[in-house]
Amino acid sequence: MPEKKGSADAKVLHCSFCNKSQHEVRKLIAGPSVFICDECIDLCNDIIREEAQATARAAIRSELPTPAEIKTFLDQYVIGQTSPKRMLAVAVYNHYKRIRHGEIKGDEVELSKSNIMLIGPTGSGKTLLAQTLARMLNVPFVMADATTLTEAGYVGEDVENIIQKLLQNCNYDVEKAQRAIIYIDEIDKISRKSDNPSITRDVSGEGVQQALLKLIEGTVASVPPQGGRKHPNQDFVQVDTTNILFIVGGAFDGLEKVIRDRTEKSGIGFSAAVRAKSERGVGELFSEAEPEDLIKFGLIPELVGRLPVVATLDELDEAVLVQILTEPKNALVKQFQKLFAMEGAELDVRPDALKAISRKALKRKTGARGLRSILEGALLDTMYDLPSQGNVSRVVLEANAVEGVGKPLLIYADESEAASGEKAGRGEVRDAAA
């Protein structure tokens, strides 16, 4: 017979963990010969949640490459630019750490995004740095040219086309696209034409900056599915850009003058100003860039504020260009040696030829970007003839061939072709024009 409520003989149940009675707690849940109260359940949940968060934080640290590891990877492909590489490594590490941090529930601290601006001369490695970062982190990457962008409604591409390209790159996997890296090149070409707000509509300058602003700071962009055109009754793909890392780059021709004018205002006397101008190069001046200089150059203050990490790249000198030709993992000379090896020939680029190529690139003011066209031009005739000549074992490129006053030397493996007087087995050295 069940005990009556309020009976003196009624057994009072207690929590098996905290020993509180059933009258001191809201709920007491029974198990096989044990009881647990709602307060102990809450405590257990808190302990499990804390352990899960600690595990998640440890996973973040273990999965993400450290800034030092990121820089080491960049060193394999990009020569020099130590300071920009360190800044990029820290910024990218913090960005993806921030994304993982946002996945941990229960943390009230919200971390803001730090997008990146790269300032440097043409061919100094801005695009290569961004591409190499994306490859290391195994995230989608898309590159856009700011000069092709116009305000929505005008002829040209609007800023949402960038997101459309990104989706196409990752097969419309929205989750993957929302962790991508977007590089916008030639950002300096959309600077407004004067310091004063535009009176007339500037559809490819300040207007584009305003459109980019929303995308960079984080918004939900509506993109037509599978690259279709927009129309009112269409279902759009929604992409949140909050966790997309934006890197913008530009040569900023003329910015050095803005910086020089600001920094030399305090100079006393004519000789001080002249000496300062002669001693400081473009790269050194760029390193002194302040937000006010970028605004004076023509970027709107809101956009400058959304790009807090500013990395300036140095000008490339002859020695660095020689290193770029030979040292990176996918160095240009190594690429051409691979092409020649496919034809059974060894390519030997002499040190004087490397210097001649570098000097030519400096003269053209194309930086590292011009190295390929110069090397290709020097070897073009040889690459044309080589597949038809099966007995060439070695091609030697010297400075005179780069400068256009000679041709690469061909060394033939067939001893019967050797000129009289040459030692047997030494092979014949012939001019490529022969």
Curated annotation (Swiss-Prot):
Ranges where the ClpX-type ZB domain occurs? 3-56
Chain sites annotated for binding ATP: P121, T122, G123, S124, G125, K126, T127, L128
Does the entry feature the keyword Nucleotide-binding, yes or no?
yes
Q: Per UniProt, where does Zn(2+) bind?
A: C15, C18, C37, C40
GO annotations of cellular component type:
HslUV protease complex
One biological process term in Gene Ontology: proteolysis involved in protein catabolic process
Give GO terms: molecular function aspect only: ATP binding; ATP hydrolysis activity; ATP-dependent protein folding chaperone; protein dimerization activity; unfolded protein binding; zinc ion binding
State the UniProt keywords alphabetically: ATP-binding, Chaperone, Metal-binding, Nucleotide-binding, Zinc
Q: What does this protein do?
A: ATP-dependent specificity component of the Clp protease. It directs the protease to specific substrates. Can perform chaperone functions in the absence of ClpP.
HAMAP family documented for this protein: ClpX
Q: How does it assemble?
A: Component of the ClpX-ClpP complex. Forms a hexameric ring that, in the presence of ATP, binds to fourteen ClpP subunits assembled into a disk-like structure with a central cavity, resembling the structure of eukaryotic proteasomes.
Similarity comment:
Belongs to the ClpX chaperone family.
UniProt-recorded name of the protein: ATP-dependent Clp protease ATP-binding subunit ClpX
Q: Which organism is it from?
A: Bordetella pertussis (strain Tohama I / ATCC BAA-589 / NCTC 13251)
